[in-house]
Regions:
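Short, flexible helix-loop junctions that flank or precede catalytic/ligand sites
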Residues: 164-550
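N-terminal, intrinsically disordered, highly charged
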Residues: 1-266, 271-278, 282-284, 289-290, ...
Length: 550
């Protein structure tokens, strides 16, 4: 239907060649089954994205569009509308001229937000169209990340606890988890303090403040969390662990919950696990073509051990899960022993360490060997017994994967030697060691090029006269002014060869094994980091802070 005598959106799309008559008929059929807005149907069918839809609406309604990422809003304009209305209506004042206010909206056909702004300001309101992502990011930038309405209207005599009944506590906890998904957080921290409760999200490896809540609701909030995680709400003096399966519009989310008693109450950390985030291709993880080729070649064959090395939180488990997903096939049996199981992998037999029941990595590995496995993943080799069992499993015709905590690939061999593993067992079973780190990606929306300073070059092992074109993020709405968005891995793959085998047999120190690897063509962590700096994936600062001085 045409709007106010104007050409209909469907007709506009056909005229521009965006869709054909058959696609329009399909959209109209869907609209008849589920009444709503035709533009949303076009989006759902993939005929156009939100920004394209806004452009057509702008032509149809003669309402301008605006890219908030390129626009800085004055503080006096932001103060014209209370924050609670901004958040509730998903609007943003952007410009004021005399008695007219330009208002950013996502749906110009919805009069409710426009009327709310008109009533709040007493001004004439002219809408401008923006995308949902832009307005969400702008609200984050100007008002902070929290979206839960505060208790600002409470009087001094109001009992804060009375404002947060059971229903409101449930809504609050659901809101915290839902928002953490939106920001692609890996962890949620709920921290009681003397005067309040601090909520923080770990985003791209860094903790960021999300919200401060009244300290009076601490007990109710943690109790709600314990109920969701099937934990003992009466136990407050001991640490507890639990699990939550949370359903949201974005899909099912698996949360691992840990509580810990502190001075001002129980602190809680939730680890967010999403299987779709774990099963990436090696290229998506950050493998360069040469390293990817060598790594996948190393997977050929039905025996040997592959170790992934690095500190906690550097993505080792994600690399192993992506590797197992690549190997998964109906004709092989993949078995894992983990602590804990971080993701539920399809067609993989996963088991968890349970020390109370006597199930350790070593004891589980003994049992796994009687399960006719082809591929075995041991979450971590922590002691001599486990590593010896893993190596003997590799000797008897199994492909074994595990992780180890060392600074680089070469010191992985020295760690094995320090565990008193026979050198000939190491040289005959270890196919290679992959060392890795995670660095933050530069936001593509605000990335700018510059020439690295002499100090930056020296920090990365270069000479001042060396050319190093670098990039950084200037900060924008898309990255919440951080300059970064997402993370990428940097890798160092040391493959076993005759020279390294002889060095291992002679108990050579790590630096000699490393030098032999470099002579054989190994790309070091620093070299891989420099590749990603020059390509604009990450910054000199990220690589230097992650790896240390060269």
């Amino acid at each position: 239907m045409a709007l106010g005598g104007k050409q209909s959106l469907g007709q506009m799309l056909i005229k521009s060649g965006k869709i054909d008559d058959e696609q329009l008929d399909k959209a109209l059929e869907m609209l008849q089954e589920n009444p709503g807005y035709i533009g949303s149907v076009f989006q759902e069918l993939g005929y156009l994205n939100e920004r394209e839809l806004n452009q057509y609406l702008s032509q149809q309604l003669r309402i301008p569009t605006l890219s908030l990422g390129n626009y800085e809003i004055q503080k006096t304009v932001l103060e014209l509308i209370p924050e609670r209305i901004i958040r509730a209506q998903k609007i943003l004042p952007v410009f004021k001229l005399n008695n007219t206010l330009n208002l950013a909206v996502t749906d110009p056909l919805d009069s409710t937000p426009i009327n709310a702004a008109r009533q709040a300001t007493g001004m004439k309101v002219d809408p401008v169209i923006v995308t949902s992502t832009e307005i969400d990011n702008a609200i984050d930038l100007y008002y902070g990340m929290s979206t839960f309405v505060d208790v600002e209207d409470a009087s001094e005599t109001t009992n804060i606890s009375d404002l947060f009944d059971e229903t409101r506590i449930v809504e609050l906890m659901d809101s915290i988890i839902t928002q953490s998904q939106r920001y692609n957080s890996s962890d949620i921290h709920i921290e009681p303090r003397e005067t309040d409760i601090r909520i923080r999200f770990r985003i791209d490896g860094r903790l960021q403040d999300f919200q401060a809540l009244p300290k009076e609701i601490s007990t109710a909030l943690i109790s709600r969390l314990k109920i969701m995680a099937n934990m003992d709400i009466a136990e407050t003096r001991r640490p507890q662990d639990g699990r939550i399966l949370f359903k949201s519009k974005s899909g099912r989310l698996d949360l691992r919950v840990s509580t810990y008693p502190t001075l001002y109450g129980e602190k809680c950390v939730m680890r967010l696990l999403n299987i779709s985030e774990a099963l990436h291709s090696l290229v998506d993880l950050g493998f360069e073509e040469e390293v990817q080729g060598k790594y996948t070649d190393m997977l050929i064959g039905n025996q040997g051990i592959v170790l992934v090395s690095g500190p906690t939180g550097c993505g080792k488990t994600t690399t192993l899960y992506s590797t197992l997903n690549r190997l998964e096939s109906p004709d092989i049996n993949i078995v894992t022993i983990e602590d804990p199981i971080e993701y539920d992998l399809p067609n993989v037999n996963q088991a968890q360490v349970n020390i109370k029941s006597g199930v350790s990595f070593a004891s589980a590995l003994r049992s796994i060997l009687r399960q006719d496995p082809d591929v075995i993943m041991v979450g971590e080799v922590r002691d001599e017994e486990t590593v010896e069992l893993a190596i003997r499993a590799a000797l008897t015709g199994h492909l074994v994967f595990s992780t180890i905590h060392t600074n680089d690939a070469a010191t992985g061999f020295t760690r094995l030697l320090n565990w008193k593993v026979e050198p000939f067992l190491i040289s005959s079973t270890v196919k290679g060691i992959l060392a890795q780190r995670l660095v933050r990606r530069i936001c593509p929306e605000c990335r700018v090029e510059y020439q690295a300073t002499n100090q930056e070059k020296l920090q990365l092992g270069l000479e001042p006269e060396d050319d190093l074109i670098s990039y950084l993020g200037g900060g924008c709405l898309a990255c919440r002014n951080t300059g970064y968005k997402g993370r990428i891995g940097i890798y160092e793959l040391l493959l076993m060869n005759q020279t390294i085998s002889e060095l291992v047999l002679n108990n050579a120190p790590g630096y000699r094994i490393r030098d032999a690897g470099v002579d054989a063509g190994m790309v070091t962590l620093l070299q891989d980091g420099l590749t990603k700096i020059r390509r604009g994936d990450t910054t000199t600062k990220e690589v230097y802070e992650t790896l240390g001085a060269a």
